[in-house]
């Protein structure tokens, strides 16, 4: 579905690929939401 497509496109978003956190992307409202990635970078970056 659309969420699955959003997951695939996550890897193409700069905020997601920084420091290899692309797999932490969350699909929200059929769009890639990188907010969780930013939070992880604050804690582990």
Curated annotation (Swiss-Prot):
GO terms for cellular component: extracellular region. Keywords: Disulfide bond, Knottin, Neurotoxin, Secreted, Toxin. Expressed by the venom gland. GO terms for molecular function: toxin activity. Its main location: secreted. Disulfide bonds join 3-16, 10-25, 15-34, 27-32. Belongs to the neurotoxin 02 (plectoxin) family. 01 (Tx3) subfamily. Neurotoxin. Causes rapid general flaccid paralysis and death in mice at dose levels of 5 ug per mouse. This is U1-ctenitoxin-Pk1a. It comes from Phoneutria keyserlingi.
């Amino acid at each position: 579905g659309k969420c699955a497509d959003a997951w695939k496109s996550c890897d193409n978003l700069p905020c997601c690929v920084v420091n290899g956190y692309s797999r932490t992307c969350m699909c929200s409202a059929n769009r890639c939401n990188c907010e969780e990635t930013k939070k992880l970078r604050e804690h582990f970056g």
